[in-house]
Structures are given as C-alpha cells and as structure tokens.
C-alpha cells in the first residue's frame, strides 16, 4: 500500500466523539488507582535519628513500669519467696538498670563504629563488657 500525503483540513469547531477501539470489559480489567493515595515513607534511618534525638532530650523511663516490676519480682522469687518491694525501691532499680543499659549500648555502638559497621552485634556487647572489666 502506497503512502499518501496528508493535507491540513479546516476544523468546523464542533467536537466529534472519538471511537473507542476496545470494548468495556477490557477497560474494567485494569484497577483504577485514582482514589488511592500512596502512603508517605521516610528514608531509612531518618526515623531512627529522630528517635535518638527525642530520647536524648527526655529524662523519662524507657522501660514500662509494670513489665519491669514483674521482672524484678520474678528474679527475686528465685532467691527468696514472699518478698515485698517499696515503690521507691523498684523505681531506684529501674533508674539504675536503664542507666547501665544506655551506657552499655553507647559503648557497644562505639565498638561497632570502630569495626566500620553501623549495626551492633553480640560481639560488640561482649567487647564493651570486656573493656569495662565486667567480664573476663
């Protein structure tokens, strides 16, 4: 079939409806994504840095009180039964425990960074405790 030259035509101004090539069933087969909005996601690490800044600013306890209290009572049960604790005693134990854990994780993070990693591992905790002199 030979090609023919296209010539410009003058438009009449009236809109002519276009013919749809496919039938209606083929149009419905694709789900419409017009109403769905994509959920916003932060880049990896952004939320972690925000949480670090938030917890460094605050002075509240990081572990919930009741689970910590149950843990203390469970450990104390192994040594002596029917022990009672004052609320201030459990509060003091929790403050000391959290201070110890935060310090340990800081040292652990330094060990991971020294090994050119950003993820802490068990060997980092072991090294931090060994340097501190807690474990030979």
Swiss-Prot record:
Q: Which UniProt key words apply to this protein? A: Acetylation, Chromosome, DNA-binding, Methylation, Nucleosome core, Nucleus, Phosphoprotein
Please tell me one Gene Ontology term that the record gives under cellular component.
nucleolar chromatin
The record describes its post-translational modification as: Acetylation is generally linked to gene activation. Different methylation states of H3K4 mark distinct developmental phases. H3K4me2 is associated with euchromatic regions. H3K4me3 is a mark of active chromatin. set1 is responsible for all mono-, di- and tri-methylation of H3K4. H3K4me facilitates subsequent acetylation of H3 and H4. Methylation at H3K9 and H3K27 are linked to gene repression.
- Which residue ranges are recorded for the region named Disordered? 1-41
Per the similarity annotation, which family is this?
A: Belongs to the histone H3 family.
Summarizing the function annotation, the protein's role is: Core component of nucleosome. Nucleosomes wrap and compact DNA into chromatin, limiting DNA accessibility to the cellular machineries which require DNA as a template. Histones thereby play a central role in transcription regulation, DNA repair, DNA replication and chromosomal stability. DNA accessibility is regulated via a complex set of post-translational modifications of histones, also called histone code, and nucleosome remodeling.
- Subunit composition and interactions: The nucleosome is a histone octamer containing two molecules each of H2A, H2B, H3 and H4 assembled in one H3-H4 heterotetramer and two H2A-H2B heterodimers. The octamer wraps approximately 147 bp of DNA.
Q: What is this protein called?
A: Histone H3.3 type b
Which source organism does the UniProt entry give? Answer: Dictyostelium discoideum
């Amino acid at each position: 079939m030979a090609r023919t030259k296209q010539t410009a035509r003058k438009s009449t101004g009236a809109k002519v409806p276009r013919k749809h090539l496919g039938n209606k069933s083929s149009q419905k087969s694709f789900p419409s994504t017009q109403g769905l909005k994509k959920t916003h996601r932060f880049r990896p690490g952004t939320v972690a840095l925000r949480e670090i800044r938030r917890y460094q600013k605050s002075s509240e306890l990081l572990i919930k009180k009741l689970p910590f209290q149950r843990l203390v009572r469970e450990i104390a049960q192994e040594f002596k039964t029917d022990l009672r604790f004052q609320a201030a005693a459990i509060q003091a134990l929790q403050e000391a425990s959290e201070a110890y854990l935060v310090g340990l994780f800081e040292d652990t993070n330094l060990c991971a960074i020294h090994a050119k990693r950003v993820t802490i591992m068990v060997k980092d905790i072991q090294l931090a405790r060994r340097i501190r002199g807690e474990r030979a």
